[in-house]
């Protein structure tokens, strides 16, 4: 507790008010006005009629000695700003700007309830402030009070119909409830009122790619946003990412490189992490692997990368491979299950290189499978943030960082998954034994217009399903009810759908994959598991879609996987999807001929 506010200390010092007054005066001389005001209030709490304390407090209030708060705000020292403002509340409580400033500080501190209260007080003092009503809407929206937030934004527009930001926020609400047509309408109204509203432009760009699958329109919006705000890292990342997703990686890299040269010194840490992460993906896709790993290191605070707040981990983070020698290392999972299975192909090489003891945090669905696959590793579901028995921690994908894994290194990564040989399945046993077992998936479990560009439809694979020499086995996880409607009844009956949960039962999936002669699909968990299990696998992806090809996907229509040499890739585009199907049929024919000695023309 601060010695100035210690009740016992006040009681002792109250015997000599002069001592307290001297302290307060010294505080004033040093510019410590909030602390001086605090002392005067403490004196007056015991001696309300003390003339010197009252007079000194009045002089401070009259002089309005509030320091320049901008440096503190820029440094995000919001607690200090709050303290200074609250020390002046008696003097300034009738000033709406005071409440607006205090509300903005609480908003930055994510205390949206107090922010709302402050802004409501400010609105009472200045009812015509449309920007203030807009901020109240933002406070309500942060608290998921969508209905009242909507009303607040509408009220702001009644007061000022040309206030573009309210249209932008109303569009955000419509987007939140997935009414994308109305959302786009509001964002278009926003840029009609104010063409430089970069937030509305950004939303329009995201909507164009995410919900419409229109890269060209998205690119146009992001380019305009970057023209208006060239120093905003989000505008840089958005535009560079659109070029990256269209396979125009050179343009993507040019944007990243030019933006970094102009703006790097001004970027805050969180934005720097997002920039580096997205930049690293373009570098990997271009084949600049070592530089990509350097940039990739900074990804840990990027949204949806790590399942926990890594700043709370008290264990030292492993920064270079030399420190890992003979140490006890905790591997913390990141991103999704497919990413886990993919990255762990480097674990055996890491252990051999460092002679380290590994504690492997795993997703519950993978616990038994990974424990069997890595018998020398301690597999855990959770860990203590300050475990003193752990020397270092690292995220899964830092295996590549530490090993500087690149196309020139051979036999570093490879299949490692071991299925349970004691596990049996009546469903698998009933598969016709005289046919080729082809397991396949066609899309991700999460679908929107943007992601569909990277995937296919079930009906695209009708020729493989209807082939009489093939057991076409569904490996697509999730609800496929709507997908099945794409097929005629005859093919729906022929598609073999396992009797277990493909999303959660990885042990049964491992058994089924082991029975397959070939597995194919997009870069999702079933195909990744097949590759990591050593099964002959074909993964199809967009030209820009395989950053882990380390440049191969931009150069070749087909190539061998750099991580698992039992896996091959086919590059495709939506405009030429028929070519993808033809090439996949050739793979199936080749496998059939190898197995039977006879050609099978699909």
Model feature map: region roles:
Residues 1-518, 523-602:
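Alpha-helical solenoid repeat scaffolds of the TPR/TPR-like class and their adjacent stem/linker regions
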